[in-house]
Amino acid sequence: MTTIDLNCDLGESFGAYKMGNDDEILPFVSSINVACGFHAGDPSVMRQTVEKAMQHNVAIGAHPGFPDLIGFGRRNMNVPASEVYDYVLYQIGALDGFVKAAGGKMHHVKPHGALYNMAATNPEIADAIAKAIYHINPSLLLYGLANSEAFIQAAEKYNITLIQEAFADRTYKQDGTLTSRTEENALIKNEEEAIKQVLQMVKEGYVNSVNGEKVAVQAQTICLHGDGEKAVQFAKRIYRTFEHNGISICAPK
């Protein structure tokens, strides 16, 4: 039986500002990525998100980003790799404290937004992320863009397990990278198209690029975004589509 992980970015509310559909999404995913206060989230939200995830027996990962609350961590920052290391180490440590306090064990690390996209093509950034994981807990898994040589090489260097990730609602360029959110066709808003793309990736191992060419993708985890208008409905549909197609949903080991 084919097995796939469904992950979602949660814990992105901040103070009085609520973001996402965390409670409704949790029953339909197998792992979550919790914002750690730099691009979103705050200490109370982090604690609450961890506790809810444990109630649902969902694998918990840190979702470190650039220190950019206003830009939601989606703007590139020109910082040295040493600072990226500090940012990532700091955020993993913060979330790990909440996970341990709740009696749990952290499962993985997935960079957020611009940090993720930069790491996918910049070996120095990817190396800094992997080094931070290695120094704090080398047993943590690293979620990174499928086929990214930068992620692959960094994980191999520090002997960290890389979980190759694909996206349900994002379009792909010919080189296998994600279409920038600054472009109009970056997001797949039609549910049928998104579900078709997911099944192609999971069952057939490829995705159609924006140019119509087939790009090989061997995904071990699929990211669902939890902050869209139809996010909950979409999560339910993908969950049931996988069940209907005999695809088991489980966090990677």
Curated annotation (Swiss-Prot):
It is an enzyme of class 3 (hydrolase). Keywords: ATP-binding, Hydrolase, Nucleotide-binding. Gene3D superfamilies: Glycoside hydrolase/deacetylase. SUPFAM superfamilies: Glycoside hydrolase/deacetylase. Catalyzes the cleavage of 5-oxoproline to form L-glutamate coupled to the hydrolysis of ATP to ADP and inorganic phosphate. This is 5-oxoprolinase subunit A. Forms a complex composed of PxpA, PxpB and PxpC. GO terms for biological process: carbohydrate metabolic process. The gene is pxpA. Pfam families: LamB_YcsF. NCBIfam families: PRK05406.1-2 (NF003813), PRK05406.1-3 (NF003814), PRK05406.1-5 (NF003816). It comes from Bacillus cereus (strain AH187). It comes from the Bacteria.
